[in-house]
Curated annotation (Swiss-Prot):
Protein name: ATP synthase subunit b, chloroplastic
UniProt lineage: Eukaryota, Viridiplantae, Chlorophyta, core chlorophytes, Chlorophyceae
Family (UniProt): Belongs to the ATPase B chain family.
UniProt GO MF annotations: ATP binding; proton-transporting ATP synthase activity, rotational mechanism
Subcellular locations according to the entry: Plastid, Chloroplast thylakoid membrane
Bilayer topology term: Single-pass membrane protein
Subunit record text: F-type ATPases have 2 components, F(1) - the catalytic core - and F(0) - the membrane proton channel. F(1) has five subunits: alpha(3), beta(3), gamma(1), delta(1), epsilon(1). F(0) has four main subunits: a(1), b(1), b'(1) and c(10-14). The alpha and beta chains form an alternating ring which encloses part of the gamma chain. F(1) is attached to F(0) by a central stalk formed by the gamma and epsilon chains, while a peripheral stalk is formed by the delta, b and b' chains.
Keyword Transport: yes
GO cellular component term, pick one: proton-transporting ATP synthase complex
Gene coding for it: atpF
Sequence intervals crossing the membrane: 22-42
Length: 175
């Protein structure tokens, strides 16, 4: 082996030269390695990249589908909320209506009871008034009857005899 001043190593006659210049050698070696890697690994790498691309596209489509489903569910939930609000408003209005009807019903029943109570009061007053008149009438009649008996028991004098006779005569003339 002979070393030449140009940094070329010659192996035998017409042999193979090896460049020992580091920068030039590294660039050549790097190009050779990249060429080998691209030729052998390129198909596999492009296949891996295509698979990854398909996976990403599939994930994006699934995410888009989930977003659409979520939007539909949100729309359905909003619709249900509006329906529930309407139903609650109807129930509230019905409750107010029923409460008003119940209040009116109670007021009318109360007025009927008051009217019956007033009627009962008037009947009671009339009854006690009749009772008082009857008692007064009986008292007056009893007093009159007592005085008549006393007069009859004492005997009639001429003035009373004339009054009694006139009474009977007036009664007979009325018939």
């Amino acid at each position: 082996m002979v070393f030449l001043p140009d940094n070329i190593l010659i192996l035998g006659h017409g042999g193979f030269g090896f460049n020992t210049n580091v920068f030039e050698t590294n660039i050549i070696n790097l190009a050779a390695v990249v060429g080998i890697v691209v030729s052998f690994v390129g198909k596999n790498l492009s296949s891996l990249l295509e698979d990854r691309k398909n996976t990403i596209v599939k994930n994006l489509e699934e995410a888009n589908q989930r977003a659409i489903e979520a939007e539909q569910k949100l729309t359905a939930a909003r619709t249900q909320l509006e329906t529930a609000k309407k139903k609650a408003q109807e129930i509230r209005e019905e409750g107010v209506l029923r409460a008003t009807q119940e209040i009116n019903n109670v007021v009318s029943q109360h007025e009927l009871r008051l009217a019956r109570l007033q009627e009962f009061k008037q009947e009671t007053l009339a009854f006690y008034q009749q009772k008082a008149f009857k008692q007064a009438y009986l008292y007056v009649i009893n007093k009159i009857m007592t005085r008549v008996r006393e007069r009859l028991n004492k005997g009639l004098d001429s003035t009373y005899h004339v009054v009694v006779n006139n009474f009977y005569v007036s009664r007979f003339t009325q018939f």
